[in-house]
UniProtKB/Swiss-Prot annotation:
This is DNA-directed RNA polymerase subunit beta'. It comes from Petrotoga mobilis (strain DSM 10674 / SJ95). The gene is rpoC. Zn(2+) 1 binds at residues 64, 66, 79, 82. Keywords: DNA-directed RNA polymerase, Magnesium, Metal-binding, Nucleotidyltransferase, Transcription, Transferase, Zinc. Its cofactor is Mg(2+); Zn(2+).
C-alpha cells in the first residue's frame, strides 16, 4: 500500500543530428573485420566477425568466450586469453561495432533525399553528383583528331598518331601550339585486298604523315600494267615479295582495322583504292568518365575560367593538367629572365618596402614570392617595360567518387559561404527562381551552423554495426539458421571492403579499383536503403533484403510496429459471452484465466503466508497452476477483490472501446460481458473476442476505477447522448411490461366512487401505493391462475389482474392516475421525480428517461437505473414469449388496389410519351414519381393494418424500437419498391411483390444489384474509413487542453447549419456545450438576457447546457426596424447605430449633419458645447439576426428577397427595409460562442474555447486529449457507416455511404481536383438580377449569373456548362452561398472570402455527410480538425528569419515572430551606440564584390568595433553581430591568444518581417507539418523527415502524445499532465475503507 508518485517524466527533449566518423568510433567497441557470423562447428561467434564477443559482449551471462571467467563476481574483468569483457549478455543489445572502409562513401539519405542535401550544399546538379559518386560517365558526341610529328607535340609527350577528342583539343589549342589533323573512325570494312590481275608481287613499306606504317602490295603483269593495294599496319600480308599470283588471290587478311582512326588524308588514300568498302564516323559518340575539380590555384582558375566544384570530362581535366605544366615551365623561364632587371614601381608591404629601381636578385625574387606577388613589371635592357609572371600555378586537383565530394565539403567555410549568399541575395528579386535557389542553400548553411554539424560528415569512411541481438541468428528445425537480412547486407559490405583493401595494397590498375569502389558504395547504399538506387539486393528467393531504412519506415517499421504498438504483458484474450446477471461495472472472468493473469499476485500472497524460501518459489509457481492448489483459489478471490481489469475489443475505434470493470470469478472459458456495454464496444456474442489487461500500479488502478470504469462511460464523448442504451430484448421486455391496448386504455375511466369500481366503462382495481399493486398482481397470478382438464381439454384460467390491465393508482400527491400493473412495476425503479405512469416505454422514451436521470441525478444513479431496466427487460421479454411466424406478417387488403391504380397511371404516362407529349427524361421522372408515391401509400396502409393488432409480435418489435423499422415491414408485407442499378440509377420497373408472397425471377434478379454493391462497398470502404481515422488522429493528436482560458475576445457566430436548402443542425444543437464569447443582449431592451427558469444571466463565459441552448435558440422578438427619439447626451447608447434627425449647430458651426451617423467623438464635441439632448433615429435591428421567413416584395412586377432567414441585419439592409415600408422584423439575438477555431492558446486549446466535456456535462478538464477524441468521434462512425450499407439490402435510397465516405475524404484532404464540374459561390451579399446561358460553344453553353451587391454594383459569375443554377432571379444571396450545382473548391473560398467562411463551408459540408446517415457528432470535433487544416500559413517571403518561401508555419507562430521582429527593430539606434568599443565574439565577414579579383574582408574574433568598422558592417546590411560583454584573454600552448567570456547578440540593421498567405492544408499534409520530428517521422515520409531533422539538429520537445509514447513515458495529457505529476496515490482495500470511515465517525 505504498504511496506512488507517478507521472514524473524523465526525458524533456530529444535531439537528432549527423553522426561524425569520430563519434561513431567513440561509441564503437571494436572493428568488425570479417564477414563470418558463427563458427559452423562450434556454433560460437567468430572473432572479429559480425557476432564477435570481444566487440559486442558475451553470449552467456557473466562468462567470457573461453570460459576462464564465470560468474557475476568477475563483472568488468577483461579476459586476457579471449579478450572478452565479463558482463551481462544484455550488452549484446546495446554495444555497437564499426567497419572502417577503405575509401570514403556517401550516405544515400543525403544524396537521394528530395531535394538532395549534397546537391544543394555543393551547388552541383543531382545527376552530376550521382555520376561522380558512382564513378559514372557522360555520353558525348564530338570530333576526333590525330597528332602529327613535331617537336611541339613531343615536348608535351604526344607521339604521332595519338587520338585527341574535340574538347581536349580545344583546350590545348587555346593555350598551346599542338599539331593535329581531323580524324575519322572506321566503323566497318567490307572485303579484303584481292589481286585484280595475274602477275608478280612487290611489297614496299612507308610511313604516313602520322608516322604509322603503310604497306603497298604492287602486282605487275607481263605487259607492265600494275595494280597497287595499300594495307595498314597490323594487317597480315598473305603473299611474299617476288611471288607470282593469279587473279583473285587474297593478298592480306584486311587492309584496315575497324574502330581504328585515320586522318582525312589517310582516309582519302584508302577511299581511292577501295571505293565503297569503308564506312566511317566523323562525329564520334562515346562514354567518358567525369570528374570534379577539388582544388585549383585561383590564378589558374581565372585563366581557364573554372572553379572548385566544376564538373569536367576526365579528358578535359588531363588536358588542363598538361596545360598547367607547360605554363609553369614558361613561368620558370620568366623567373630566370627577370633576374638583374629593375623594378618599374615601388612595392610596399607592412613588413618591407621595395623601392622603384631596385635590382631584382634571386634573393629579392624569393622575398617577393613569399609576400605572394604573382606578377611584377620590370625594365628590359632596351628600356621597355614588361610584365613578368614569377609565381607558378600551385595546384589543379580533380577526382571522382565520394572521396572527391568529401574534399569539396571539407573546403566549405560555412560562415564565409553564408556571408556570400546573403550578399548575393541582397542584389536579387526575392521572388526570382535564382533567389529561391540561393535561399534554399542559405537555409541549409544556416542549419549546419546552428546544429554544429559539419558538411564533410555527409561522407564517411566509418559505418556503425548495430548490436547483434537486434539482428539475431535464430536456429530453426534441422540445425539450420534463419538470419536477419541486415547480416547479409553487412556481410556484403565487409567482403567488398576487404577485397578493395587487397586491391589497393596490390596497387591494382585504376579501372579495377574504381569498379570495386563503386560496388562498395552500392553495398553501403543497400545497407542503408536497399532499392533506392538501382536494383535492390535480394536473397536467393529474389526477395529484396530489408535494410536499415526498411526497419524504420512503414507499417512494419520500428516506429509503428514497436514504438507506437507494443505488445503488453499481463494480458489475455477470450471469446465473450453475455452476462445478464452482472452489474454494469462488472465482468465475468474465467477462473483459470484469472489465475494465470494474477499469478504473481497470488504467488506473492502464498509465499508471504507459507514462508517458502526463494529457491523453492519457482517450483511453487508451477504447482499453483498445474496442480490448482485449493489455497490459490482463496487467495485469488482476495487478490481480485476491487482490482479493476481493462477490456478491449478490436477494432479500437474510439476511447470507449477500452473500459474498466471489476472482475467476478466464473466457471467456463469465456469472458462474461454486461449486455449494456455492447454498443460502445460494438460487440455482439456471435464469436467476438475481447482482450483483457491488468493495470498493475496503484495509479493505473486508480485511473481505471475513477476514469475508465464502465459506469462512468455511459455518455458518448462524440455527442453527449447515452451510449450504453438498452437494445433488442431489453427494449422488447420493457415495452411489453409497460404496454396497453390503446382503445381499452383510452375508454376505461378512473372511478370517483367505490361503487363504480369494476363496472362497465370503469377500471376494475384501484391501489393506494405501488407496493400494494405489485403484491396484488403477484398474489392473484398464483391464486387465480390455474390449469385444469375439462371435457378432455386443458383449460388455462387467467388471473383477474393481468399485467396490461388498466388500473387506478393513487399517486403521492393525492391524484388518482390511470395506469397498468406493468407501468407501476417499471416505475418502482425510476427516480421519483421522473416517474411517468402513462407512457409506454419504447426505445425513444427509454433514451429520454436515461438522459434525464443523468442530467438530474448524475452518472451513478443512471448506471443503477440501467441495471434495473436490464433486469426488468430480460425478465419480461422471457415472460412475453415473443416469437414471430409467417402468420404474423399481415398484408393490407388495399395493397393490390393501390398497385393496380399505379400501373394504370404508368400506362397513361407511356401513352403520352408515345404520342410525343413527353421527352424520355420527363417520362422516366414521372414514372419514378408514381412508384415512389405508390410505395409510400402501400407502406401507410400496411402500418394501419398492424396498428389494429397491438400485440402482434412484429408490430411490437417495430413500435418499441427493439428491432426492424417500417421500411423493412413494407418489404415483408407491402412491396419492395424501386431498386437501383449498380451505377446508382433507379430502375423504373419496381418490385411490386413482398417477401411474404415471394419474388418472381426477374424481381429477384433486379434486387441482387443493390445487395451485391452493398457487399462490395463494405469490403472496399472499411479500409478507407480506417485510413481516414488514422490520418485524423495523426493531424489532431497533439491538441490537448493546456490552459483554463486563453483570454481571447474572439468567437464564432452561432447559426443553424444549412447545406443546399436542407437544414443540417438546429441552433440549439450548435449552442449546446459551448461557452459564450460575448454577452447575449435582448434585441428590445439591449440588456443581457435573463432566464428566470434557470435563474441565469447569459453573460460572457457562461457554459450553455441543453436547456440554456433551447432557451436562447427560441428567444425571438419582433422589433421595429428603426425608431425616432430624443436622447440625453449622457444616456447615449454605445452599441446602437444612431443618425441625427436634424443639423446640430453651435454658433453657426455644424457639429452633426442631418442623416449623419452620431459617433462617440461627435457626442463628446456636442457635450463640450453644452448641448443636452439630441433628436435621433435609432436603427434598432442592426447587428441582430433575422429569424422570420424570407422577406419578399414585388418590385417592377418581379419578386425580390430583401431579407433572408438567418441573415445578420446591417445598416444598408435596415435602410432598404425602411425604404420599402417594412416597419418591424422578427429577430433573435446575435450569439457569439467560443470555438476551437478562434482559440489563441499557443499549444493545444483552452478549456473555455472547447467548452463542455460531452461525456460528463462539465467544463472540460485541463489535459483532456480533445484532438484524439475529435478524430475518433469522426472516424468511428465512418467505419460504422461502411459496414451498415448491406442492411438496406440495396434498396434505392437517395443517400448512401458510397457518396458519403469519398466526399468526406475529399473535404478533409481539400482536394484541388474534385470529381465532376466545379460549382460557383457568391463572393458578396446581394440580389440575383439575371441568370442566362452564353452563346453556344463547342462543349455547351456556359451559365452566367449576375448579382447586384449591396453597393449597387453588378458582378458577373460564369459557371461550367454542365452545372445548373440553384438560385432564382430576385433571390438574395449571402457571401459564400452556393449559386450553382457542382463541387465548390474550398481553396477558392479561402482566397476570395477568408478563413471564417471557409471554416463555415467545411463544417456544413462535412456535417451534412454524417447527418444524412443519421450520425450525430458535435460541431466542436469537426472544428478541431478544421482548425488544424487552416492553422498554417505559407511563407511568401521569409524576411530575415530562417523560413523559406513555401514553408508552412502555424499562423500564431508567424504573428508572434513578426511582433518580436518589430519590437527588436525599435532598439537598433540604441544597439549601434552600445556595440562601439566592444570586441567581436564571432568573426564578421564582408564578402568581396568580385570573389576572383578581391579577398573577402574578415573582422576576426577579438577585433574592437570602431565607428568606421561598424559603418562598414551596417553598409553591408549585416543584421546581427555578437560581441563580448565580459571577457578574458587565454594563451594556448602554441603561444596564440584568444578571448573567452560571455557574449551577446545585437541587432544593428532592421530585420524584415515575414510575408505570408493563409493556406488550407489537407489532413495528411497537416500531419507532416509539425514542429516535433518524432511524430512526423512516425506518420509518413520517414526518411525525408529524419534527414532534414538531422541536418538542422532538430530538438523535439515532446509536446505531442505520439512522441511521448515513442520514448516510453506518460503522455502530456490527462493524468500525464505536469499539473497532476506530483500527486500521490494509494490503493485502499474495501474493508480498510470501512475501517477508515468508522474511525472518522467515532472521531
Amino acid at each position: 500500500m505504498a504511496n506512488v508518485s507517478s507521472f514524473q517524466r524523465k526525458i524533456a527533449k530529444i535531439k537528432i543530428g549527423i553522426a561524425s566518423p569520430q563519434s561513431i568510433l567513440e561509441a564503437s567497441n571494436g572493428e568488425v573485420k570479417k564477414p563470418e557470423t558463427l563458427n559452423h562447428r562450434t556454433g560460437k561467434p567468430e572473432k572479429d566477425g559480425l557476432f564477435c564477443e570481444k566487440i559486442f559482449g558475451p553470449v552467456k551471462d557473466y562468462e567470457c568466450a573461453c570460459g576462464k571467467y564465470k560468474g557475476k563476481k568477475y563483472e568488468g574483468t577483461v579476459c586476457e586469453r579471449c579478450g572478452v569483457k565479463v558482463e551481462s549478455k544484455e550488452a549484446r543489445r546495446r554495444k555497437i561495432g564499426h567497419i572502417e572502409l577503405a575509401t570514403p562513401i556517401s550516405h544515400i539519405w543525403y544524396l537521394k533525399s528530395s531535394p538532395s542535401i549534397l546537391s544543394i550544399i555543393l551547388n552541383i546538379g543531382v545527376k552530376d553528383l550521382e555520376n561522380i559518386i558512382y564513378y559514372g560517365s557522360k555520353r558525348v558526341i564530338e570530333r576526333a583528331y590525330l597528332t602529327l610529328p613535331g617537336p611541339e607535340n613531343e615536348n608535351l609527350g604526344y607521339l604521332p598518331g595519338e587520338i585527341l577528342y574535340q574538347r581536349e583539343y580545344e583546350i590545348y589549342d587555346e593555350y598551346l601550339d599542338l599539331r593535329v589533323e581531323p580524324a575519322v573512325k572506321i566503323v566497318s570494312v567490307k572485303g579484303m585486298p584481292v589481286a585484280d590481275i595475274d602477275g608478280k608481287v612487290e611489297i614496299k613499306s612507308e610511313l604516313t604523315h602520322t608516322e604509322r606504317e603503310l604497306n603497298w602490295i604492287i602486282i605487275r603483269d607481263d605487259t607492265g600494267v600494275e595494280r597497287k593495294y595499300p594495307v595498314f599496319e597490323g594487317s597480315s600480308i598473305m603473299v611474299e615479295n617476288g611471288q607470282e599470283v593469279e587473279k583473285g588471290t587474297p593478298l592480306a587478311d584486311r587492309f584496315l582495322f575497324e574502330e581504328d582512326y585515320l586522318t582525312q588524308k589517310e582516309y582519302s588514300l584508302f577511299l581511292e583504292y577501295y571505293p565503297g568498302s569503308i564506312e566511317v564516323e566523323r562525329d564520334i559518340e562515346r562514354d567518358t568518365p567525369i570528374v570534379v575539380i577539388t582544388d585549383i590555384d585561383k590564378r589558374f582558375a581565372k585563366r581557364i575560367d573554372k572553379k572548385i566544384g566544376d564538373i569536367l570530362l576526365e579528358d578535359e581535366a588531363r588536358a588542363y593538367e598538361e596545360v598547367m605544366k607547360v605554363l609553369n615551365s614558361k613561368i620558370k623561364e620568366e623567373r630566370e629572365n627577370v633576374i638583374d632587371k629593375e623594378l618599374v614601381s615601388e612595392i610596399e608591404f607592412p613588413e618591407k618596402k621595395f623601392e622603384k629601381g631596385t635590382k631584382i636578385t634571386q634573393e629579392v625574387l624569393n622575398e617577393l614570392q613569399e609576400f605572394g606577388v604573382k606578377d611584377l613589371v620590370a625594365k628590359e635592357e632596351d628600356g621597355t617595360e614588361k610584365i613578368f609572371q614569377i609565381n607558378r600555378y600551385e595546384k589543379f586537383e580533380y577526382g571522382y567518387g565520394a572521396e572527391a565530394i568529401q574534399k569539396l565539403l571539407t573546403k566549405i567555410d560555412l560562415e564565409v559561404l553564408k556571408a556570400r549568399l546573403e550578399s548575393e541575395l541582397e542584389k536579387l528579386d526575392r521572388k526570382s527562381q535564382k533567389s529561391v535557389k540561393i535561399l534554399r542553400r542559405l537555409k541549409l548553411v544556416k542549419d549546419f551552423i546552428k546544429s554544429g554539424n559539419q558538411p564533410e560528415w555527409l561522407i564517411t569512411n566509418i559505418i556503425p554495426v548495430i548490436p547483434p541481438d537486434l539482428r539475431p541468428l535464430i536456429q530453426i528445425d534441422g540445425g539450420r539458421f534463419a538470419a536477419t537480412d541486415l547480416n547479409d547486407l553487412y556481410r556484403k559490405v565487409i567482403n567488398r571492403n576487404n577485397r578493395l583493401r587487397k586491391l589497393l595494397e596490390m596497387e591494382a590498375p585504376e579501372i579495377i579499383v574504381r569498379n570495386e569502389k563503386r560496388i562498395l558504395q552500392q553495398a553501403v547504399d543497400s545497407l542503408f536503403y536497399n532499392g533506392r538506387v538501382g536494383k535492390p539486393m535480394t536473397d536467393r528467393n529474389r526477395r529484396p533484403l530489408r535494410s536499415l531504412t526498411d526497419l524504420l519506415k512503414g507499417k512494419k517499421g520500428r516506429f509503428r510496429r514497436n514504438l507506437l504498438g507494443k505488445r503488453v504483458d499481463y494480458s489475455g484474450r477470450a471469446v465473450i459471452a453475455v452476462g445478464p446477471d452482472l452489474k454494469i461495472h462488472e465482468c465475468g472472468l474465467p477462473k483459470k484465466m484469472a489465475l494465470e493473469l494474477f499469478k504473481p499476485f497470488v504467488l506473492a500472497e502464498l509465499l508471504r503466508d507459507s514462508n517458502v524460501a526463494s529457491k523453492s518459489a519457482r517450483k511453487f509457481k508451477k504447482t499453483i497452476i498445474e496442480k490448482e492448489m485449493p489455497e490459490a483459489w482463496e487467495v485469488l478471490e482476495e487478490v481480485i477483490k476491487g482490482h479493476p481489469v481493462l477490456l478491449n475489443r478490436a477494432p479500437t475505434l474510439h476511447r470507449v472501446s477500452i473500459q474498466a470493470f471489476i472482475p467476478k470469478l466464473i466457471e467456463g472459458n469465456a469472458i462474461r460481458l454486461h449486455p449494456l456495454v455492447c454498443p460502445p464496444f460494438n460487440a455482439d456474442f456471435d464469436g467476438d473476442q475481447m482482450a483483457i489487461h491488468i493495470p498493475l500500479s496503484n495509479i493505473a488502478q486508480a485511473e481505471s476505477k475513477f476514469l475508465m470504469l464502465s459506469r462512468y462511460n455511459i455518455i458518448s464523448p462524440a455527442n453527449g447522448k447515452p451510449l450504453s442504451m438498452p437494445g433488442k430484448d431489453i427494449i422488447a421486455g420493457a415495452y411489453y411490461l409497460t404496454m396497453h391496448e390503446d382503445e381499452k386504455f383510452k375508454n376505461l375511466k378512473v372511478p370517483t366512487k367505490v361503487s363504480e369500481l369494476g363496472k362497465n366503462g370503469y377500471v376494475k382495481h384501484i391501489f393506494s401505493e405501488d407496493l400494494e399493486a405489485t403484491y396484488a398482481y403477484e398474489y392473484l397470478k398464483i391464486v387465480d391462475s390455474d390449469i385444469y382438464l375439462q371435457d378432455g381439454k386443458l383449460i388455462w384460467k387467467k388471473s383477474d389482474l393481468p399485467l396490461h390491465e388498466p388500473v387506478a393508482f393513487r399517486y403521492k400527491d393525492g391524484s388518482i392516475l390511470k395506469t397498468t400493473i406493468g407501468k407501476i412495476i417499471f416505475n418502482e425503479e425510476v427516480p421519483e421525480d421522473l416517474r411517468d405512469y402513462t407512457q409506454k416505454m419504447d426505445k425513444k422514451n427509454l433514451k429520454e428517461l436515461i438522459f434525464n436521470t443523468f442530467e438530474k441525478h448524475g452518472i451513478d444513479r443512471t448506471a443503477d437505473l440501467l441495471d434495473s431496466i436490464k433486469d426488468f427487460g430480460f425478465h419480461y421479454a422471457t415472460l412475453s414469449g415473443l416469437t414471430i411466424s409467417i402468420r404474423d406478417v399481415l398484408v393490407s387488403p388495399k395493397r393490390e388496389e393501390l398497385i393496380e391504380e399505379s400501373k394504370g397511371e404508368v400506362l397513361r404516362i407511356e401513352s403520352l410519351y408515345e404520342e410525343g407529349y413527353l421527352t424520355d427524361n420527363e417520362r422516366y421522372k414521372e414514372i419514378i414519381k408514381i412508384w415512389e408515391s405508390a410505395t409510400a401509400k402501400v407502406t401507410e396502409e400496411t402500418a394501419k393494418t398492424y396498428r389494429k393488432y397491438t400485440f402482434n409480435p412484429i408490430w411490437m418489435m417495430i413500435e418499441s424500437g427493439a428491432r426492424g423499422n417500417i421500411d423493412q415491414l413494407k418489404q415483408l408485407a407491402g412491396m419492395r419498391g424501386l431498386m437501383a442499378d449498380p451505377s446508382g440509377k433507379i430502375i423504373e420497373v419496381p418490385i411490386t411483390s413482398n417477401f411474404k408472397n415471394g419474388l418472381s425471377e426477374l424481381e429477384f434478379f433486379t434486387s441482387t444489384h443493390g445487395s451485391r454493391k452493398g457487399s462490395a462497398d463494405t469490403a472496399l470502404r472499411t479500409s478507407t474509413a480506417g485510413y481516414l481515422t488514422r490520418r485524423l488522429v495523426d493531424v489532431a493528436q497533439s491538441i490537448t487542453i493546456t490552459e483554463e482560458d486563453c483570454g481571447t475576445d474572439k468567437g464564432i457566430e452561432a447559426r443553424e447549419l444549412w447545406a443546399d436548402d436542407s437544414k443540417i443542425e438546429n441552433l440549439s444543437d450548435f449552442l449546446f456545450g459551448r461557452v459564450l464569447a460575448k454577452d447575449v443582449l435582448d434585441p428590445e431592451t439591449k440588456e443581457v438576457i435573463f432566464n428566470p427558469q434557470a435563474d441565469k444571466k447569459y453573460e460572457r463565459g457562461i457554459i450553455l447546457k441543453e436547456k440554456d441552448a433551447q432557451f436562447l435558440a427560441n428567444y425571438v422578438k419582433e422589433i421595429p426596424v428603426s425608431k425616432e427619439k430624443t436622447i440625453k447626451i449622457e444616456d447615449m447608447p454605445k452599441d446602437s447605430y444612431l443618425e441625427s434627425l436634424e443639423d446640430v449647430q453651435v454658433e453657426g458651426k455644424v457639429l452633426i449633419k442631418k442623416g449623419e451617423e452620431i459617433t462617440e467623438e461627435a457626442i463628446e464635441e456636442a457635450f463640450l458645447h453644452g448641448i443636452q439632448k439630441l433628436d435621433v433615429k435609432e436603427y434598432t435591428a442592426v447587428d441582430y439576426v433575422y429569424s422570420g421567413e424570407d422577406l419578399k416584395v414585388e418590385i417592377d412586377g418581379k419578386t425580390v428577397t430583401l431579407l433572408k432567414y438567418q441573415e445578420r441585419i446591417d445598416l444598408k439592409v435596415s435602410k432598404v427595409l425602411e425604404k420599402h415600408g417594412i416597419k418591424t422584423v422578427t429577430v433573435r439575438p446575435s450569439i457569439f460562442i467560443r470555438s476551437p477555431l478562434t482559440c489563441e492558446s499557443e499549444n493545444g486549446l483552452c478549456a473555455k474555447c472547447y467548452g463542455m466535456d460531452l461525456s460528463n456535462y462539465k467544463l472540460v478538464n485541463r489535459g483532456e486529449a480533445v484532438g484524439i477524441i475529435a478524430a475518433q468521434s469522426i472516424g468511428e462512425p465512418g467505419t460504422q457507416l461502411t459496414m451498415r450499407t448491406f442492411h438496406t439490402g440495396g434498396i434505392a435510397t437517395t443517400s448512401d455511404i458510397t457518396q458519403g465516405l469519398p466526399r468526406a475524404e475529399e473535404l478533409f484532404e481539400a482536394r484541388k481536383k474534385t470529381k465532376g464540374p466545379e460549382g460557383e459561390f457568391s463572393k458578396t451579399k446581394g440580389i440575383v438580377r439575371a441568370i442566362e446561358r452564353d452563346t453556344e460553344n463547342k462543349r455547351g453553353r456556359r451559365l452566367k449569373i449576375i448579382i447586384e451587391n449591396s453597393d449597387g454594383e453588378l458582378e458577373s459569375y460564369e459557371a461550367d456548362y454542365r452545372t445548373k443554377a440553384v438560385v432564382e432571379e430576385g433571390d438574395k444571396v449571402l457571401a459564400g452561398q452556393r449559386l450553382t450545382t457542382g463541387n465548390i473548391k474550398p481553396r477558392n473560398i479561402l482566397k476570395e472570402l477568408g478563413v471564417g467562411p471557409l471554416a463555415n463551408y467545411l463544417l456544413s459540408e462535412i456535417k451534412k455527410i454524417y447527418a444524412e446517415q443519421g450520425v450525430d457528432i458535435h460541431d466542436k470535433h469537426f472544428e478541431i480538425i478544421i482548425r488544424q487544416m487552416i492553422n498554417k500559413v505559407e511563407i511568401i517571403d521569409g524576411g530575415d528569419t530562417d523560413f523559406m518561401p513555401g514553408d508552412l508555419v502555424s499562423y500564431g507562430k508567424v504573428q508572434k515572430i513578426n511582433e518580436e521582429i518589430l519590437e527588436e527593430n525599435s532598439y537598433i539606434t540604441e544597439n549601434r551606440e552600445l556595440v562601439v568599443g566592444k570586441k567581436l565574439a564571432k568573426r564578421v565577414i564582408i564578402p568581396a564584390e568580385d570573389e576572383e579579383e578581391e579577398e573577402d574582408k574578415i573582422f576576426e574574433q577579438g577585433t574592437e568595433i570602431t565607428e568606421e568598422i561598424l559603418n562598414q558592417i551596417i553598409e553591408t546590411n549585416i543584421k546581427e553581430i555578437e560581441v563580448y560583454e565580459e571577457y578574458k584573454e587565454i594563451t594556448t600552448e602554441e603561444g596564440k591568444t584568444h578571448l573567452v567570456g560571455t557574449s551577446k547578440k545585437y541587432l544593428i540593421n532592421p530585420k524584415d518581417t515575414i510575408k505570408y498567405e493563409r493556406r488550407l492544408l489537407r489532413i495528411t499534409k497537416a500531419s507532416l507539418e509539425r514542429e516535433g520530428w518524432l511524430s512526423a517521422a512516425s506518420f509518413q515520409q520517414t526518411v525525408q523527415i529524419l534527414t532534414e531533422a538531422a541536418i538542422e539538429g532538430k530538438v523535439d520537445r515532446l509536446k505531442g502524445l505520439k512522441e511521448n509514447v515513442i520514448v516510453g513515458q506518460p503522455i502530456p495529457a490527462g493524468t500525464g499532465l505536469k499539473l497532476y505529476a506530483d500527486q500521490n496515490y494509494e490503493v485502499v482495500q474495501p474493508e480498510k475503507e470501512a475501517e477508515a470511515a468508522q474511525e472518522k465517525s467515532v472521531g
